[in-house]
Structure formats: structure tokens, C-alpha cells
Amino acid sequence: MIFGGAFDPLHQAHIYIAKRAVQAIKAQKLYFVPTAKAFFKSPIKASNQARLAMLRVALKALPQMAVSNFDIKAQNGFSFNTVQHFKQRFPNAELYFLIGSDKLSELAKWHNIEQLQKLCRFVCYERFGYPIDEQLVQQFNVRLLGKCPLDLASSEMFGSHKFRQIPAKVLHYIHQHNIYLKTILQTLLDEPRMQHCLRVGQLAKTLAVANKLDGKTAYTAGAYHDLAKQLPQAQLEKLAKVAGVNDYPSWKVLHSYAGAYILKHWYGLNNSAVFSAIWNHTVPPQKMSQLDMIIYLADKLEPMRVHEEWAKGIDITALVKLAKKDLKLAYQITLKYVRSLQKN
């Protein structure tokens, strides 16, 4: 059985459907075949190699399923070519092609659909919002699987709790390699703010390495530090309350708490060091970890800050240099300066 799609990202509905199809058809093997980026109708966010890797992580514990890189390797854009490839590979096998009801209405437009029907049989599951057209079922001799109970679409995973509907091991892999970091930022931030976040991430990584800390963790915390910065006040206050924050000097500091909460509870990033660094970057507590200090400094000292009015009273270049040798001293100097501005 062939199951094509972007899988960008793979989610629990994909796994549910695949298991249901294997069981219903009694298929010996189901192959996930990720579409080549150049041929998918919508922009694909993750690289070809990242999508293949995520699928392999997900399918390790599912021996009846495997990943095929045919479409990606061949830069193939037609399902007909995909099915031909599998027919050549398994000449005596009965081939099935798994589709959702959203694709059922498009079958008549598929390349070489008449020949394709001779090579395989279509198996269709019903997706939310795409009712089954019985006339098309008859026309294309489609076998129905029933309705998928999970209302999920890869295009709707970002900016909501639905991202948690990614298999746990895949979710861990995504965050380990920051596969969707820019996409997550773009969901909530405009371009200038996102670029600020990426610069903070880069400087945080540099400072972490200089202080013998993990650069990747620092980059992640730095890049995500302002994730919630542009949310409206009412939403920030609501998220802060849910996160347990009721006492704060101004609603403008709430993005740190909201951002940490969103990363953990929407996107499933369970890293206490990253959470702490983001949480503490607006109102630093008495006790700050090294990573906390690094994110605070990277936010205040990233390269473009030199053009901002508030930073004219400090030497950003000198403080960055100092932070590589004496992190705590650089933090204390910067914090003292920032607090002096707040008093004025």
C-alpha cells in the first residue's frame, strides 16, 4: 500500500489512518512516500531529508510500515510514476493507493488516471470537512475505510495545541533539530521581530560556547525568547494567568511567561533550561542560571541594538567581549544599566 503526502509534519491522524488501512486491507506493507518539495501544491516547511528522518523515527516501532524516498530522489510529481515504481519493485503484488476524501474529488484530473486505475486500487478515508462523493467512489472503484476520528491537518498544526498531536518521538526529534523553529516564529511574529530573535539565538550560542555550555540549547532559548512578544495584551494576560503569573510590573513583560508557556504546552518543548531562560528574561529574579544570564545578555546586546537610543550609554561590543570571559560580571553591568534607565 502506498501513502503519499507532504507529512509536514507527520501527525497522529497519519498514523491512525495507516494502521486502519493495513488492518482493513490486510496489507503486508504500507509505504509512506513523502512528496518532493518542488511538486507539492503548498510550500513545504521542512527539508526533504528532515521529513524522511521524522518518518523513520515514527515508524521504528511499526514493522508493517516503511518509508520510501522515491518521489524525493526522482523529483517525481506524478502518482502514476510512483505506482509504476512500486509495480516494478513488486510485480506480483496487488497495489493499493491510500488517499483522503479531499483528494477523491481531484482524481479525474490526475495524470494518466485511466492507466493508474489499472495498476492499483484506491483506498479512501473520510476527512473532516470533505464528505464522500458516492458517485466518484463508484466511478473509480474506491474502497472506503470510514471516517478518521482525528480532525488534524499538517497545515493547521502551527499556532495551536494541535502541534502536540505529533507522535512523541517525532516531537522530540523536531525540537532536538529545530526543524520548525522558523515556522513557529513566523506564526506569531512579523519579520523584523523574528530576525531579532534569530540574532539573539546566534549571540546566545556564541556566548554559551565561550562559557562551555551547550550552544544548541542556548540558540533554541534565544531564538524563542520573544515568541509571544506580539500577542495582544488581553491574550498575554490570559496566558500569564494560566501559567500562574498574577503579580507583574507591566503587561509588557508578560511575553516572557506566555512564550515559555506556549513553547511547553502548545509545542511540547520540554526543556527546563530553555523554559527558565525565556521565563526570566524580562524580570530577572535574584537567582539566575548561566543560561538565564546568557539569554538576558543576548537580548540586550545583539548586534542591531547599537542603533537603538537606549543602548547609547553602554559599549555593546565591549560587553559581548566581557561576557565571553566573565559572564556574571557582564550580566551585572548590563542589568544595572537597564534598571537605571527604568528608574528614570
From Swiss-Prot:
| UniProt: ADP binding residues | 196, 226-229, 255, 281-282, 299, 305
Q: GO: which molecular function terms?
A: ATP binding; hydrolase activity; metal ion binding; nicotinate-nucleotide adenylyltransferase activity
Q: In which pathway does it act?
A: Cofactor biosynthesis; NAD(+) biosynthesis; deamido-NAD(+) from nicotinate D-ribonucleotide: step 1/1
List the SMART domains.
HDc
UniProt KW keywords? ATP-binding, Hydrolase, Iron, Metal-binding, Multifunctional enzyme, NAD, Nucleotide-binding, Nucleotidyltransferase, Pyridine nucleotide biosynthesis, Transferase
Q: Where does Fe cation bind?
A: 196, 225-226, 299
Q: Which NCBIfam families match?
A: bis(5'-nucleosyl)-tetraphosphatase (symmetrical) YqeK, nicotinate (nicotinamide) nucleotide adenylyltransferase, PRK07152.1
**What's the name of the protein?**
Probable nicotinate-nucleotide adenylyltransferase/Ap4A hydrolase
